[in-house]
Curated annotation (Swiss-Prot):
Component of the RNA degradosome, a multiprotein complex involved in RNA processing and mRNA degradation. InterPro entries: Enolase, Enolase-like_C_sf, Enolase-like_N, Enolase_C, Enolase_CS, Enolase_N. Its cofactor is Mg(2+). Belongs to the enolase family. Keywords: Cytoplasm, Glycolysis, Lyase, Magnesium, Metal-binding, Secreted. (2R)-2-phosphoglycerate binds at residues 167, 341, 370-371, 392. It catalyses: (2R)-2-phosphoglycerate = phosphoenolpyruvate + H2O. The active site is at 209 (proton donor), 341 (proton acceptor). Binds a second Mg(2+) ion via substrate during catalysis. This is Enolase. The gene is eno. SUPFAM superfamilies: Enolase C-terminal domain-like (SSF51604), Enolase N-terminal domain-like (SSF54826). It holds the Pfam family Enolase_N.
Length: 429
């Protein structure tokens, strides 16, 4: 049995030029596992705490030397000599050492980086691909699937400096036969969308997640531009390709109203649910994330009752990858899907528990990046190793996004005939 002989933390940069945490876990046989913690822009209020230094003279207060110090000090001392393959024991030990509800003492960024680095070291020690090790940890050895990519090709909201209120407009290549075919389809649509926007005299600069970020007349205008790009790429909208939204509605919710400032419109919960329902009737939208504010559970129930039978309703800020909150949502019939983000909860073990709870209740689980990413591609292995069926990792440019797609291509090649891609069957309706 290999043992942990050293743990090192360091401050590195994420895709927005902000500091984040990287950890190395070293084993007594020379193996090293390394992992980086991502960081979000539109965040749920109940996410685990990302520990920042607050020193305004350094990185405008966003340094992570405190979190790094926690890795190099108390976390290292705690885990030296431990078995890296006992993921639950490692994660529970760090959670207990932290002792807070939201990992505020050590920092979710510190705990997560070590948690993932340990998993990578353990996978190497057992001569397993990371996705296979994750499947074993998940209690589903050998059960894999390639995820349908939800490609964010127009950015708005907190992810772009434009007038578009909805944060993400995505395409899903549900008609593809394989993941690699689906990735090609999405890439072709992305390039055709650039041409469509250019022809309209619109900006083709990209946002945080690599999608285009033009000023558009309305959210419906964004959907129309994508529909045109799909057609120009030679695909049939609604059959080959479907659409998805991430409203990130908490970002434009105030005093009980949903304010679409880009369109000069304001709605109550029922009105905004009807607005979204109307979009699903005019476009083949099969997934909507954070359609209402994270605290507006009554509004979420209205939306679920209106379109939940036909449309995947994903809780991101709503559930924050937290089993306690998810359990309550399941009991109340709120949404029908959970977005899975490692750093919302802060450990691999708790992430797997959230996926398992969702699946047991008939909810789908969508594996997701954050807007602040690195070259770390662990979420690709997580999607395959849990057979989640869906992944959100941005657009088809920026290496922080493409690194995940490229890792999925490698995994598909390794799995060969076992690389099952289910397409439309991964979604409701």
């Amino acid at each position: 049995m290999a043992k942990i002989v050293d743990i090192k933390g360091r401050e590195v940069l994420d895709s927005r030029g902000n500091p984040t945490v990287e950890a190395d876990v070293l084993l007594d046989n020379g193996i090293i596992g390394s992992a980086c913690a991502p960081s979000g822009a539109s965040t749920g209020s109940r996410e685990a705490l990302e520990l920042r230094d607050g020193d305004k003279s350094r990185y405008m207060g966003k340094g992570v030397l405190k979190a790094v110090g926690n890795i190099n000090g108390p976390i290292r001392d705690l885990l030296l000599g431990k078995d890296p393959s006992d993921q639950k024991a490692l994660d529970r030990a760090m959670i207990e050492l932290d002792g807070t509800e939201n990992k505020a003492k050590l920092g979710a960024n510190a705990i997560l980086a070590v948690s993932l680095a340990a998993a990578k070291a353990a996978a190497q020690d057992q001569d397993l691909p990371l996705y296979a090790h994750i499947a074993n940890l998940n209690g589903t050895p050998g059960q894999y699937s390639m995820p349908v990519p939800m490609m964010n090709i127009i950015n708005g909201g907190e992810h772009a400096d434009n007038n578009v209120d909805i944060q993400e407009f995505m395409v899903q290549p549900v008609g593809a036969k394989t993941f690699s075919d689906g990735l090609r389809m999405g890439t072709e649509i992305f390039h055709h969308l650039k041409a469509v926007l250019k022809a309209r005299g619109l900006n083709t600069a990209v946002g945080d997640e690599g999608g285009f970020a033009p000023n558009l007349a309305s959210n419906e205008d964004a959907l129309g531009a994508i529909a045109e790009a799909v057609e120009k790429a030679g695909y049939k909208l609604g059959t080959d390709v479907t659409l998805a939204l991430d409203c990130a509605a908490s970002e434009f919710y105030e005093d009980g109203k949903y304010n679409l400032s880009g369109e000069g419109k304001s709605f109550d919960a029922e009105g905004f649910a009807d607005y979204l329902k109307g979009l699903t009737e005019r476009f083949p939208i099969i997934s909507i994330e954070d359609g209402l504010d994270e605290s507006d559970w009554a509004g979420w129930k209205i939306l679920t009752d209106k379109i939940g039978e036909k449309v995947q309703l994903v809780g991101d800020d709503l559930f924050v990858t937290n089993t306690k909150i998810l359990k309550e949502g399941i009991e109340k019939g709120i949404g029908n899907s959970i977005l899975i983000k490692f750093n919302q909860i802060g450990s691999l073990t708790e992430t797997l528990e959230a996926i398992q709870m969702a699946k047991a209740a008939g909810y789908t689980a969508v594996i997701s990046h954050r807007s602040g990413e690195t070259e770390d591609s662990t979420i690709a292995d997580l999607a395959v190793g849990t057979a989640a069926g869906q992944i959100k990792t941005g657009s088809l440019c920026r290496s922080d996004r493409v690194s995940k797609y490229n890792q999925l291509l490698r995994i598909e090649e390794q799995l060969g005939a076992k690389a099952v891609y289910r397409g439309r069957a991964e979604f409701r309706g």
